Regions:
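Short helix-to-loop capping/linker segments positioned immediately adjacent to catalytic or ligand/cofactor-binding
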Residues: 31-36, 66-73, 85-95, 147
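Extended, charge-rich, solvent-exposed interface segments
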Residues: 2-58
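Active-site flanking loop/helix segments enriched in acidic
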Residues: 55-76, 120-124
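A ubiquitous short alpha-helical element
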Residues: 10-16, 68-70, 124-128
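Primarily single-stranded nucleic-acid-binding OB-fold modules
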Residues: 40-44, 71, 133
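Metal-centered catalytic cores of metalloenzymes
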Residues: 7, 17, 71, 75, ...
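Divalent metal-dependent catalytic cores for phosphoryl transfer on phosphate-bearing substrates
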Residues: 76, 87-168
Length: 168
């Protein structure tokens, strides 16, 4: 028996974590690479070129308890939804596939700020006060504003919504 050096601790030794994260991320990248719209490509690249974001995205949980409630759960959930969007979009010729696939990627990214997953999963203060939809919208708007020339209507089309939000 000895002392455990918490600086060398790997949380995956103590809490449930996605085991094949690199493989799941590769699946996600392959599908997103099929997005042809230049503005959407720039937006997607802005996320994947951002190492601090990627580190947090790879580790984030998608929920506190109901689904994908483990480290890496947000990556897994996002990949599954992007796969579904890419598969279903061609069934609806009037739908812009690139927009649907990109929106599927964006839809829960606010959970990076909404949830924290240490030894236990819980909501952050921002998560309790405003939630992942508002946080995700702000994240997306900040990124699109940083890309010169992104059409404003495209920003509006990408605003994530949630079935729990009531219409006015």
């Amino acid at each position: 028996i000895g002392f455990y050096d918490k600086k060398q601790a790997d949380l995956s030794d103590f809490i449930e974590s996605l085991e094949n994260g690199a493989e799941v991320e590769q699946q996600l990248r392959q599908i997103l690479a099929t997005v042809a719209d230049p503005w959407l490509r720039k937006l997607l690249n802005s996320y994947f070129d951002d190492e601090p974001f990627l580190g947090r995205f790879r580790a984030a949980t998608a929920a506190k308890a109901w689904h994908h409630a483990f480290r890496g759960g947000l990556l897994k959930h996002t990949t599954e939804l992007v796969e579904l969007a890419a598969a279903v979009a061609p069934l609806f010729p009037e739908v812009n596939r690139d927009l649907v696939v990109t929106a599927a990627f964006l839809h829960d990214l606010g959970k990076i700020e909404e949830m924290e997953a240490g030894l236990a999963i819980d909501y952050t203060t921002a998560g309790r006060l405003v939630g992942h939809i508002v946080i995700g919208n702000q994240m997306m708007l900040d990124r699109t504003r940083a890309i010169t020339g992104v059409p404003a209507p495209l920003q509006l089309q990408l605003l994530p919504t949630d079935k729990r939000l009531k219409e006015a």
